[in-house]
Amino acid sequence: MLFRSHFRMVFAVAREAGWIPPGTRFEHAQIGLVLGPDGNRLRTRSGDNVQLSDLLQEAVDRARGILVELDAAARFDPAEFGTIAEAVGIGAVKYADLSTARESTYVFDWDRMISFRGNTGPYLQYATTRIRSIFRRADGEAAAGPGAAAARTAGIAITAGPERALALKLLGLGAVLTSVGETAEPHRLCAYLFDVASLFTTFYEECPVLKAEPASLRASRLALCALTLDALTLGLTLLGVPIPARM
């Protein structure tokens, strides 16, 4: 309450001074504490405050180690692998912070943050690049039917439950963005994106896309993939989470 009262006075003074244009609304978006594993405020081992540059570098280093364990280093040249590790590490930190209700206190947990499972940045980055890979294969199999370009104009026919669940969730993107703008609570967008990615995983596992027949069904499912890719890309971009070209 003390902080809220302080900022109300600051905004009132700024308005009287003419620094705030008429009709402009200012609000203080209060945030909670970030705790270390010991339950105290996040600090270095020596007890000093954590520097953001050091924290992000450690995130990149940890992401690189996890990607090596997943054999990703063998699939990319060193330059691209370094770019991917940087995107995953920095994206993980950003997403972990924004996915928590901003007034809540949370524990800074590296293992949870850089995990490729659950509501995390790496999971959503992987889901997005996975859809991109579907379109790369679609373009490489032109003889099999419609490719990526056609998916942008194809109609969508709902033929299975997972398709319906995903399509309905995609329809809610606009409302979620409006809610985030009105409340200054980006964790709502994070929760939505996680739901989209989870529903897409179920859809992709249960509904053949590139092998779907007839060609009209293949085009329909590619169109649903395209809309999912658009939603995830927009959401992660708004959150400032980088998306690697491949993972």
Describe the residue ranges of each PLM region.
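Non-catalytic interaction-recognition regions
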Residues: 1-247
